[in-house]
């Protein structure tokens, strides 16, 4: 042991060594203990008795090489640390190899003492192979890693330690063993008739969050197990591909043609008569007709149920949806459903239409239809039919995660990175207007700062919020044609206002997959210019409530206002009735006075049965004062003041206002 090796050890280890050498350790520091231990080892070298069974092996290497092999990080000549893999390290390695070539040790023969009756010496059982984690590999030294790589049949070469760890971690598999010659393989047993084969594992569909947590290698294996071709897709595109198409691969069953051939063989073997064959044909044709009718009725019921239960029908009855405010964007993000189209357009897009070809789709060379799944190819062809019906042809952009920004940049004659930067700058400047909208529906823990930072990265997909922000930042309208619900299409327009009526960017959209540029057949549109000034932010005071809740609150407010008006009208009606009763009482009291004074006669005469010429005093009415008319005028002015005060909250509710006016007039008695 030299001084450097001694100083590298801990104080407790040195104290234990000193105790074994009977050296006192009280009050001594590390350097003093090292000096005494080294002196003791020099003066008292360890005595080793030669083994009687083995002759001492000749010394192969020099003491310097022994010290260097014991610790390859220290130069034995100078005692200083050296760099592993450096020039001094390589020089020492070459010297020690030349000075001491490796001599293979002779193989021991079994002892002749054993009798031939006994079984031969057993070889040690092979160590069970255990895959090591990356942390365990990092803790190993480089020499151990090199030996481990060679045992796995790998060529480490001159790789550094991190690359060597990755090489072993990826390729660590147990070596194949040849079958033992002593034991013949046992014959395969026939399956037991009592035990049925174990059922197949139940397929469980995974959510989008669970797919996002998986690694890309796991996603590729899952896609291949589902019969999909992942290709060179990025992780977001791979997640969407698996989420849309995750269905268990069904086993191949006998086709209808094979079944029919079997049935024909059976029928030919039985040889029925002509009458029975004609009857069977008639019954089969009838069954086919009934089955076709049942299929039609079931398809009609499915269509009707879809139309009645689908939320997209309740959202809008039109084929165009405008996204011009933050509230519209909030509804679009919350609904996350396609917009329905008129039935006339859906009839023209019947699924039986197959008269289009791949040559009609004008796509770039990078868009290979063979690498796409079948449902995406069908959706792409359907989008091509929709585009042609609307007077557009499809122009593809690269599938690199920047497709939305590339389509917009094509209209502005610039790159996708410029459009992305304008969008990110606008979102950072106007972040307060979008705070109430969730940044990510699948992962609510992501806040707006993380969302904007991710959106700034290259190959990050753009969503509805990014498209809305880009339309406001660059002052253009984004008209998007998409295939919604199989064979139905719809238009969605982002950023519609009066200032950008001529600045339109048309694009097609494959759901959760790709954006495609649309150009009219008449000619290419003019190239748009990027505005020099910053666009204004949307108003931040827009509430985060849905339109249905706002409409419900307005209806409740209208009902409360109408009830209050009816109560006030009833109070006014009661006052008018009381005033009319008072005026009628006053008028009747004044009319009790007779116009002709009666004559008093002492003689009792029988009254004649003639009708008097003078009318009765009770039937004579004097002219009443016009108090009720004045009261009506006062109440009408009061009602007019009430209507003027309530006119602003009821501007958009003309029907409610007219109904309340009619009720007021009926209560007053004017109508």
Swiss-Prot record:
Ranges for domain OTU: 392-521
Membrane-spanning intervals of the chain: none
Active site per database record: 400, 403, 514
Record field: compositional bias (Pro residues): 182-200
Single annotated GO MF: cysteine-type deubiquitinase activity
Keyword Protease in annotation: yes
Reactions performed catalytically: Thiol-dependent hydrolysis of ester, thioester, amide, peptide and isopeptide bonds formed by the C-terminal Gly of ubiquitin (a 76-residue protein attached to proteins as an intracellular targeting signal)
Keyword vocabulary terms for this entry: Hydrolase, Protease, Thiol protease, Ubl conjugation pathway
Gene Ontology biological process: DNA-templated transcription termination; protein deubiquitination; proteolysis
Segments of this protein annotated with the region Disordered: 36-62, 100-123, 171-203, 250-319, 589-625
Protein name (Swiss-Prot/TrEMBL): Putative ubiquitin thioesterase 232R
Organism from which the protein derives: Invertebrate iridescent virus 6 (IIV-6)
